[in-house]
């Protein structure tokens, strides 16, 4: 029986101890140890493997300086989002060796990176974390209208996807860590921006902003409208659908809704989700449908490279917008006019 037990358990030894994105992150943190302020904000264990959730920060240490947070890997299957943030971190370190404009920029703003929020899920190739909880459904608030069956968040059990966790239970460690990072590193500042990179929904790429729980207007709609307008003028062929998430679907427990509502009202906190549309990748390579990874990530190397190139402009734009915020943040009558323009664009009946 002892031999049989050993034989049955043997396949576990062939499971990898890590995964490519996590090793990339460790290499980047090692390379950038003299430039980044590195923290471990929580740890997670999956099948005997332990992974740390890291943040890396760089730039101004002034707590009043504008800041941008780049997040990825909240869903373990969506590797391309983590790859995008990691690629940007790697490029940033390379540019620091010669880019004087970047050095000056970082004297006035701060960048915070959290590229793999859910390393346990990414190692296990699951959307959820090791406890079976979908982190992007884990916040306590409920939508104020009906949500899509299951996909909007459910409490039936972890054996079904989009599980929110038990009602009244503490939030999952990874979700709580993300919220702490937002609270201490971003939302406490007069201006902060967050970009959370996901994949797997739609024929095209989208930039979503609050709310996901309601169709009501976010208080900083004028600021979001200005940001959209500036980006379109700087990159007129960008191809993103820039809209409230509620235009697509409502959901329970969205972390960014929760973080946004907790931010001090006197500060401007602008959280966004970059949703990379994977359906076009599947259309070009239908065999991806038969792979869990292929449903959420480009498989062919040239397609992955194209995705990483394409979205770097957005990340650079957000950093420049934060640096130049005094030139575009709306005030007074202009803000009221922009609010009406935003309502006309996103909330008139014909736009819904």
What are these regions (language model features)?
Residues 38-49:
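N-terminal cap/lid segment of alpha/beta-hydrolase-fold proteins
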Residues 66-73:
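Short beta-strand element of the alpha/beta-hydrolase
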Residues 75, 117-118, 200, 277:
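Catalytic metal-binding/acid-base residues of hydrolase active sites
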Residues 73, 113, 135, 195-198:
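Divalent metal-coordination and catalytic microenvironments
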Residues 54-64:
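Short beta-strand-to-loop junctions in surface cap/lid or active-site-entrance loops
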Residues 2-28, 32-35, 149-352:
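C-terminal accessory segments enriched in acidic
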Residues 64-65, 80-128:
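Short helix-loop-beta-strand segments that form the rim/entrance of peptidase-like active sites
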Residues 115-158:
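Surface-exposed loop and adjacent secondary-structure segments within mature catalytic domains
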């Amino acid at each position: 029986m002892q031999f049989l037990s050993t034989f049955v358990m043997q396949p576990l030894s062939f499971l990898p101890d890590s995964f490519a994105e996590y090793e990339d992150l460790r290499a980047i943190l090692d390379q950038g140890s003299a430039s980044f302020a590195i923290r471990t904000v929580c740890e997670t264990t999956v099948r005997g493997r332990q992974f740390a959730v890291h943040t890396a920060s760089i730039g101004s240490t002034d707590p009043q300086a504008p800041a941008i947070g780049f997040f990825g890997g909240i869903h373990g299957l969506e590797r391309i989002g983590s790859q995008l943030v990691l690629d940007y971190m790697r490029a940033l370190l390379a540019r620091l060796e010669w880019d004087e404009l970047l050095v000056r920029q970082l004297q006035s703003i701060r960048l915070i990176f959290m590229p793999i929020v859910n390393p346990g899920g990414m190692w296990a190739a699951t959307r959820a974390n090791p406890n079976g909880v979908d982190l992007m459904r884990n916040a306590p608030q409920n939508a104020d209208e009906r949500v899509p069956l299951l996909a909007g968040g459910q409490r039936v059990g972890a054996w079904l996807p989009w599980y929110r966790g038990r009602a009244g239970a503490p939030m999952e460690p990874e979700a709580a860590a993300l919220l702490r990072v937002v609270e201490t590193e971003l939302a406490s500042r007069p201006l902060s921006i967050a970009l959370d990179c996901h994949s797997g929904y739609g024929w095209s790429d989208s930039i979503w902003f609050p709310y996901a729980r309601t169709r009501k207007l976010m208080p900083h709609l004028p600021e979001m409208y200005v940001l959209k307008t500036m980006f379109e003028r700087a990159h007129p062929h960008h191809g993103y659908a820039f809209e409230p998430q509620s235009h697509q679907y409502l959901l329970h427990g969205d972390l960014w809704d929760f973080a946004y509502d907790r931010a001090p009202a006197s500060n401007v906190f602008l959280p966004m989700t970059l949703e990379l549309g994977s359906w076009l990748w599947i259309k070009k390579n239908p065999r991806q449908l038969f792979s869990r990874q292929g449903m959420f990530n480009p498989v062919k190397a040239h397609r992955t490279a194209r995705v990483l190139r394409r979205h770097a402009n957005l990340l650079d734009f957000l950093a420049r917008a934060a640096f130049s915020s005094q030139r575009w943040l709306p005030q007074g009558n202009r803000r009221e006019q922009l609010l009406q323009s935003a309502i006309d664009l996103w909330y008139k009946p014909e736009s819904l």
